Amino acid sequence: MGNRKLSKRQKERIQSIQERRRERANLKNSIGDKALEDLADLGSETTGTVVTNYGAQVDIEGDREPFVGTIVRCFKRANIDSLITGDRVVWRPAEPQGVVVAREPRQTELIRPDNYGKLRPVAANIDRIAIVFAAQPSPQSNLLDRYLVAAEAQGIEPFLILNKTDLLDHQSYPQVDKLLQNYQFIGYKIIRVSVKSSEGIDQLQTYLSQNNSIFVGQSGVGKSSLINQLQPENNSPVGPLSAATNEGTHTTTASKLIHLNGGGVLIDSPGIREFALTHLSQESIINGFKDFRPYLGNCKFRDCQHDREMGCALLDAVAENKVLADRLKNYRQIIQSQSHK
C-alpha cells in the first residue's frame, strides 16, 4: 500500500496517542509511595545533581558524604515532574536503586523541541551557553542568532566558540572572519580553538572554570572532540561529517553533566540543527537581539514592524552602521518563520 498523506487532525491524533503511550511507559517505571516499602535499606534524604536523564530513571551525583562524587542510578517518585540534566534534587539511597523524592526549583532551563515538535527542557541551572560552530559545516548567522535569542530570553549568558580553526583556508577564512567581526562588534565573547593544534584550549578551560556551561551547536562542529580535549577521560564518541550532506552525524544521544578538571561544570547536549523559538513572543525575540535594545520604542509608529516604515529607529540605526543589516534580516526571517508555525 502506498504512503497516504495524513490530515492535520490525523497527525495530531497520532501524536496524542504516542504521547500517552510514552507517559504510561514512564509511569510504569516511576515509583509510588507503596513501592518504597519494597526497597531495602532506604537511607536518609540527601541532595545531588542529575548527571544524565534516561527517561524513567536518572543518574544522580551525590554532593554529601558518603556519596560525594558517586553516581547512583535512581527511580523518581510518580508525583515528580520530568527531570533533566543539571536538576538539583533530593534523593534517598536504597537497594538496588535510589529514589528521587523532590526536585528543587530551576534557576534556568534550556528548551528545545522533541521529535513531535513539543517543547522539552533539556538542561537546567546553567550559567553560560557555549555556541560551538566551525568552518565545516559552513556557519550560518541565522542559526547562531537563534541560539543567541534563546539564551538572551532565558537570561543565560551566551558566548561563541569557533572550533576547527585549522580547517580555515583562503576560501573559507574571509567569510568566517567577517562573521566573527560582526559578533565582536555586537559585544559577544568569541574563543577560537582547534583540537588538532590545541589553539585556544587553555583560554577556553579558564573561561569555563567558574561556571555551569552547556555546549550547543550543529552536529559535526566538533563538540565531542572538544570535550574530549578538555576532559580526556570523558571519551565522548566522535562522529565524522557526512560526505553526502557535509553535515555531522549525531553522536551524543542524551545530555550528560561533566566536571572539568580545571574547574566548572559542562553539559554535553545532543546535536541541535535548529533552535526552536516557537515558545517566545515577538517582543521576547526582538529583545533577544541585544544590539536592538537601545532603539526599541523609538520608532515613529507604535506598531512598526521594522521593515519599510518611515521613522523606523532600527532602519535608521542600520543606515548609520550602528546595527548590522544581517542581524535585522535574521530577525525578520525568524519572525516570518514564527508566523508559519
Regions found by a protein language model. Give the residues of each.
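Walker A/P-loop
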Residues: 219, 224, 229
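Helix-rich effector regions associated with P-loop NTPase G domains
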Residues: 2-14, 44, 72, 81-87, ...
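Canonical P-loop GTPase G-domain recognition
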Residues: 167-221
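Catalytic P-loop NTPase motifs of RecA-like helicase/translocase cores
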Residues: 139, 168, 199, 273-276
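C-terminal effector/interaction modules appended to NTPase cores
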Residues: 1-152
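Arginine/glycine-rich "motif VI" loop of SF2 helicases in the C-terminal RecA-like domain
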Residues: 150-157, 181-185, 294, 340
